[in-house]
Design a protein with these regions (language model features):
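Cleavable N-terminal export/targeting peptides
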Residues: 1-30
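Flexible, solvent-exposed loop segments that connect beta-strands
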Residues: 45-62, 94-107, 139-164, 193-203, ...
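Residues that define the transmembrane beta-barrel architecture of outer-membrane proteins
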Residues: 31-33, 64-68, 105-111, 125, ...
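Transmembrane beta-strands of outer-membrane beta-barrel proteins
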Residues: 33-39, 68, 84-88, 111, ...
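Short glycine/proline- and aromatic-enriched beta-strand/turn motifs that initiate or cap beta-hairpins
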Residues: 20-66
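Residue-level signature of outer-membrane beta-barrel architecture
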Residues: 41, 74-78, 117-119, 137, ...
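Predominantly the C-terminal beta-signal and adjacent terminal strand-loop region
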Residues: 21, 26, 48, 85, ...
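Short loop/turn motifs that connect adjacent beta-strands in outer-membrane beta-barrel proteins
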Residues: 21-32, 78-84, 120-126
Length: 215
């Protein structure tokens, strides 16, 4: 993962000169606005104090849980001399964590503020490394576990009892656009403590892969 972060940062620091170049829904050589849609997969987990003590049963949610992402985005060029863009939008994303037969499902609404830099890779292909903060709110969440006494599957809410709804952190990654088609891979790590008590520190994080279109 450290090598992945280093590669993204190095790519963002590389500032090759940009000639006339257009790719799909937005042009890198002039100021304009673009819109997009995203659909993808997340591999979420919880870090820090991820154990929940309940009736002498310890559940650790640090393992990866697969979820989906749906989003609409909007982007705006920030500079007249360089292909630097600000992209935001509204994301619905499923995160959480698991450990064997125990899972924690977190459904969140998320607003990122991403800085993207456009690099011409080939004709009609743009490489777009990005980094920026995100702000998230948990709209629904539950934990699922097997009751040790009855052996039956149980569910209960996690917000207000174990976790806070508000979250924030940073995203970084890299996108690739070909004509209207867009793909990206990245990682997001929470910096806000979402544990619902002062004795624990819990952060949400996720690896994500998204596909979509830019108009």
């Amino acid at each position: 993962m450290k090598k992945f972060f280093a590669a993204i940062v190095a790519l963002m620091l590389a500032m090759p000169s940009m000639a006339q170049f257009a790719s799909g829904g937005f042009e890198l050589d002039k100021s304009n606005l673009y819109y997009g849609a995203r659909f993808g997969i997340t591999f979420g987990g919880l870090s820090g104090d991820t154990e929940v003590q309940d009736a002498n049963l310890i559940m650790d949610y640090s393992g990866r849980k697969t979820g989906i992402t749906l989003a609409g985005v909007i982007g705006l060029r920030l500079s007249q001399t360089a292909p630097v863009f600000l992209e935001s939008g509204l994301y619905y994303t499923q995160r959480g964590g698991k450990d064997g037969k125990y899972t924690a499902d977190l459904n969140c609404l998320e607003i990122p503020l991403l800085i993207k830099y456009g690099i011409q890779a080939a004709d009609h292909i743009a490489v777009l490394p990005f980094i920026g903060p995100y702000f998230a709110y948990g709209v629904a969440g539950e934990r699922e576990y097997i009751d040790e006494t009855s052996g039956e599957k149980q569910k209960e809410g996690v917000y207000k009892k174990f976790l806070n709804r508000n979250d924030m952190g940073f995203k970084l990654g890299c996108g690739l656009e070909y004509n209207l088609l867009y793909a990206e891979i990245g990682y997001q790590f929470g910096i806000a403590n979402i544990a619902d008590n002062d004795n624990n520190t819990t952060h949400a994080n996720a690896l994500f892969v998204n596909l979509g279109v830019n108009f």
